[in-house]
Amino acid sequence: MTASLSIIGGYLGAGKTTLINALLRGALPGRTAVVVNDFGAVNIDADLIASADGDTISLTNGCICCQISTEMVDTLTALAARGDLEHIVCEVSGVGDPGRMARWRSFPGLTAGPLVVCVDGTSARRLLHDEYVGDVVRAQVAAAEVLLATKVDLATEAEVADAVAACLETAPSTPIHLGDAADPSTTLREIFAAEVPDIAPAPQAPGGPAAAADHAGLHSSTTVEYREPVDPERLAAHLAVLSGDLVRAKGTVLAADGIRYAVQLAGGRVEVRPHAAREAAGTTSAIVLIAAGPDAAAVAERAAAQLAALTREPARLAP
């Protein structure tokens, strides 16, 4: 069996992780392997994990999740040699250019799947025209062979129509699918069955999803690490106040009741929910804050300082 290799891109908070989790739950026919930069960001449901071996997590439904720790060539060579996969999907960094990953789809032993870019259905136009990150988002949308508008269940019909129109201004001939939170499988099967244009030869130089020309100069991140339990609702309230300054925030916190919560900020909205591993090992909590613009570093540091004061014992700040 020859697997197809597809690329998933999209700006920070556009819904890539939600898409990846749907794929790992078996949204596509046959076995799927997803290649990511960091296992921790995917938040795989503990009930789905059959085994974990180094950089590979095997799931009970036959799908696997791989973390890039060496070179892209090594990872794809190993996956192509398995012979039991129908789909391989590589995630590109939220500030990366998925177009630069497109040539990997001609890797020996694989066939080319589509280059899919996620766009936030609630904030697409704002991001496409943002003073600081608009160029990044427009490049991602322009590179897409298929666009997936996410979070449409959180948007009004007018907002969804405006998001679609904004995307078509940048990519007028690119098909756009509306995500269906209730039934993601049907939409994803249509997307990953899309026709693919001719692909240039795969690069031989080392690299991986993280090497895809990200716009690091525009973005700055700071991590807040708590050493004692955190009130997730209080943290969420402070993130809501900071939503105009940050383009993304994501992490997990351990509450006083011993339950671990996933907390994230995307598109100006804050979400708090129990983590897939509700009673995850360890007592630390951490949240990554990302700002964009010429003063991104200072903005991220100020936001981190505010959040660090939420516990009696000062939190640790890390780049």
Report residues per predicted region.
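Short amphipathic alpha-helical segments and helix-helix/interface helices
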Residues: 24, 91, 102, 138, ...
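Helical mechanochemical/support elements of P-loop NTPase systems and associated helical scaffolds
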Residues: 4, 68-71, 97, 133-140, ...
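C-terminal accessory "lid"/substrate-recognition subdomains
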Residues: 146, 152-286, 291-319
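Short glycine-centered, acidic/aromatic-flanked micro-motifs in structured strand/loop junctions
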Residues: 10, 22, 150-151, 291
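Short glycine/proline-enriched loop/turn "hinge" motifs that connect secondary-structure elements
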Residues: 109, 139, 277-281
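Alpha-helical scaffold elements adjacent to nucleotide-binding pockets in ATP/GTP-utilizing enzyme cores
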Residues: 75, 100-104, 140-143, 162-166
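Nucleotide-state-sensitive switch-loop elements of NTP-binding domains
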Residues: 2-135
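Conserved beta-strand/loop subsegment of P-loop NTPase cores
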Residues: 33-34, 89, 111-120, 139-152, ...
